[in-house]
Amino acid sequence: MLTLKIFVYTVVTFFVSLFVFGFLSNDPGRNPGKRED
């Protein structure tokens, strides 16, 4: 059970980091021709 909990925390942390990285990289001045809702 402890292994499962560690695995879940690792996956959640990974996705949160990925989301934060993508959010910070999504600079409007970086992609002028690309528009995202």
UniProtKB/Swiss-Prot annotation:
<keyword id="KW-0604">Photosystem II</keyword>
<keyword id="KW-0793">Thylakoid</keyword>
<keyword id="KW-0602">Photosynthesis</keyword>
<dbReference type="InterPro" id="IPR037271">
    <property type="entry name" value="PSII_PsbI_sf"/>
</dbReference>
<dbReference type="GO" id="GO:0009535">
    <property type="term" value="C:chloroplast thylakoid membrane"/>
</dbReference>
<protein>
    <recommendedName>
        <fullName>Photosystem II reaction center protein I</fullName>
    </recommendedName>
</protein>
<keyword id="KW-0812">Transmembrane</keyword>
<keyword id="KW-0674">Reaction center</keyword>
<keyword id="KW-1133">Transmembrane helix</keyword>
<dbReference type="GO" id="GO:0015979">
    <property type="term" value="P:photosynthesis"/>
</dbReference>
<dbReference type="GO" id="GO:0009539">
    <property type="term" value="C:photosystem II reaction center"/>
</dbReference>
<comment type="similarity">
    <text>Belongs to the PsbI family.</text>
</comment>
<dbReference type="Pfam" id="PF02532">
    <property type="entry name" value="PsbI"/>
</dbReference>
<dbReference type="InterPro" id="IPR003686">
    <property type="entry name" value="PSII_PsbI"/>
</dbReference>
<feature type="transmembrane region" description="Helical">
    <location>
        <begin position="4"/>
        <end position="24"/>
    </location>
</feature>
<comment type="function">
    <text>One of the components of the core complex of photosystem II (PSII), required for its stability and/or assembly. PSII is a light-driven water:plastoquinone oxidoreductase that uses light energy to abstract electrons from H(2)O, generating O(2) and a proton gradient subsequently used for ATP formation. It consists of a core antenna complex that captures photons, and an electron transfer chain that converts photonic excitation into a charge separation.</text>
</comment>
<keyword id="KW-0472">Membrane</keyword>
<comment type="subunit">
    <text>PSII is composed of 1 copy each of membrane proteins PsbA, PsbB, PsbC, PsbD, PsbE, PsbF, PsbH, PsbI, PsbJ, PsbK, PsbL, PsbM, PsbT, PsbX, PsbY, PsbZ, Psb30/Ycf12, at least 3 peripheral proteins of the oxygen-evolving complex and a large number of cofactors. It forms dimeric complexes.</text>
</comment>
<keyword id="KW-0150">Chloroplast</keyword>
<keyword id="KW-0934">Plastid</keyword>
